[in-house]
């Protein structure tokens, strides 16, 4: 027997040291210790209820597991590479503590369904953390939007000035992105939190197990349907990894705008000192490094998604050791997503906006051109003709170094006799925003409705 290996009965030679180092996972999957202990406690109690082990042994197992939890959390627990992973480390220590009872714990269970359970619980627990952190960013965006309902700035398409919008509308766009992320996480969790215990290695087990009671004890939504699928499925991790990637994509977009708006050529925001750094050579610099790093870390999370997709590609049924490579990318993603969400909430809350600069920027780029086209439509001009006439007016204003609102009535008449004195009220930027009365638009009533909906959701 290979010394120290819980599976070593049929082996006569020791595992090569380099192989142990190469194949171990305890250096990172120890992060799943709490889920492993919770799953083992539930399994032991179920075995006792089903008469597979005695109630006394189940009690000793749960007491031993609780002691191990305390040892781990106090830093006393010794993690051993030769034990390969978190599961074998804990079971080995359990046997040291409670003897034969510890050796009965694995009855009716394989590491295949054990690791599937632990990883599902871990991913689900982290999803619930992400949900709370997403709420924090939405709350920060909503609070800033509430403060800036009346602040206007250029809305852009193609990063070119397009139409005036409220700053609240702009910020709420990100709040709604993250609100969808929250819903995705909630939906994902229903598929993650499914109990695979009882699938054993791949074919089920001969013991009279009760997976439903284990699922209930662990607050899971249900049990597996097919034992082979249960031990080889990593859809749940892939889906959670995608949710994390999309959260980072949305925050990376917001980071990009923070970076742009902090540039003096925009000058829309005053970057908080707590979320900026300086230059080693240029004393005047105040760099948006936090937003840049978050934007960069988005690629790291995407890498985890591609890593898991590639790992799963072409795997035959059922469990394969390739699946050991599912956890490290997700653990890294969790650290990145969790930290990014927490930092983003603080950064958004600390932002100060240069509202005068934003409103002055409205005069560049003919943001009221659509208003002129709509005005002409109101005079009975077909929209395509109105579009053409407005284009001529823009060209005229551009040639004369004016905004549309600065043209004289005589100059307007050179492009259309239908334009009257009332056009000047139409070209006012604030009036343009106030006329956007459709559902979801930048008009005050719509913005107020969006704020109310998000505030109600946040308080629920």
Curated annotation (Swiss-Prot):
Keywords: Amino-acid biosynthesis, Arginine biosynthesis, Cytoplasm, Lyase. GO terms for biological process: arginine biosynthetic process via ornithine; L-arginine biosynthetic process. The keyword Metal-binding does not apply. Gene3D superfamilies: Fumarase/aspartase (C-terminal domain), Fumarase/aspartase (Central domain), Fumarase/aspartase (N-terminal domain). InterPro entries: Arg_succ_lyase_C (IPR029419), Argininosuccinate_lyase (IPR009049), Fumarase/histidase_N (IPR024083), Fumarate_lyase_CS (IPR020557), Fumarate_lyase_fam (IPR000362), Fumarate_lyase_N (IPR022761), L-Aspartase-like (IPR008948). One of its GO terms (cellular component) is cytosol. It comes from the Bacteria. One of its GO terms (molecular function) is argininosuccinate lyase activity. Pfam families: ASL_C2 (PF14698), Lyase_1 (PF00206). It catalyses: 2-(N(omega)-L-arginino)succinate = fumarate + L-arginine. Its EC number is 4.3.2.1. It is found in: Cytoplasm. Pathway: Amino-acid biosynthesis; L-arginine biosynthesis; L-arginine from L-ornithine and carbamoyl phosphate: step 3/3. NCBIfam families: argH. HAMAP family: Arg_succ_lyase. Belongs to the lyase 1 family. Argininosuccinate lyase subfamily. This is Argininosuccinate lyase. It comes from Oleidesulfovibrio alaskensis (strain ATCC BAA-1058 / DSM 17464 / G20) (Desulfovibrio alaskensis). The gene is argH.
């Amino acid at each position: 027997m290979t010394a120290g290996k819980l599976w070593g009965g049929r082996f006569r030679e020791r595992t090569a040291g380099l192989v142990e180092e190469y194949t171990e996972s305890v250096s990172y999957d120890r992060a799943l210790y709490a889920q492993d202990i919770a799953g083992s406690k539930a399994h032991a109690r179920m075995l006792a209820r089903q008469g597979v082990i005695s109630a006394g042994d189940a009690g000793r197992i749960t007491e031993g597991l609780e002691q191990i939890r305390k040892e781990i959390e106090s830093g006393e627990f010794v993690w051993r590479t030769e034990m390969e992973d978190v599961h074998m480390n804990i079971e080995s220590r359990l046997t040291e503590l409670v003897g034969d009872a510890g050796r009965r714990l694995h009855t009716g269970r394989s590491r295949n369904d054990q690791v599937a359970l632990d990883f599902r619980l871990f991913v689900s627990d982290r999803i619930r953390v992400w949900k709370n952190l997403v709420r924090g960013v939405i709350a920060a965006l909503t609070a800033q939007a509430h403060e800036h309902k009346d602040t206007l700035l250029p809305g852009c398409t193609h990063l070119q000035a397009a139409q005036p919008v409220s700053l609240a509308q702009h910020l709420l766009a990100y709040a709604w992105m993250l609100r969808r992320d929250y819903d995705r996480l909630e939906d994902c969790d229903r598929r993650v939190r499914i109990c695979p215990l009882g699938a054993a290695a791949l074919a089920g087990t001969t013991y009279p197990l009760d997976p439903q009671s284990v699922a209930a004890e662990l607050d899971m939504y249900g049990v597996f349907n097919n034992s082979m699928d249960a031990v080889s499925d990593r859809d749940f991790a892939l889906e959670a990894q995608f949710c994390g990637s999309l959260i980072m994509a949305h925050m990376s977009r917001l980071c990009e705008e923070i970076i742009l708006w902090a540039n003096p050529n925009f000058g829309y925001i005053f970057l908080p000192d707590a979320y900026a750094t300086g230059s080693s050579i240029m004393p005047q610099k105040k760099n948006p490094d936090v937003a840049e790093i978050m934007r960069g870390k988005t690629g790291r999370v995407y890498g985890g998604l591609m890593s898991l997709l590639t790992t799963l590609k072409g795997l035959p049924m059922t469990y394969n050791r390739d699946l050991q490579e599912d956890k490290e990318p997700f653990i890294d993603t969790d650290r990145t997503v969790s930290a990014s969400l927490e930092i983003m909430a603080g950064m958004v809350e600390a932002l100060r906006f240069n509202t005068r600069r934003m409103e002055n920027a409205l005069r560049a780029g003919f943001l009221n051109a659509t208003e002129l086209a709509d005005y002409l439509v109101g005079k009975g001009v077909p929209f395509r003709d109105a579009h053409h006439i407005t284009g001529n007016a823009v060209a005229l204003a551009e040639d004369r170094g004016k905004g549309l609102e600065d043209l004289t009535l005589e100059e307007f008449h050179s492009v259309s006799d239908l334009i009257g004195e009332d056009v000047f009220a139409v070209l006012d930027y604030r009036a343009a925003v106030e006329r956007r009365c459709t559902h979801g638009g930048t008009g005050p009533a719509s913005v107020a409705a969006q704020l109310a909906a998000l505030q109600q959701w946040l308080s629920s």
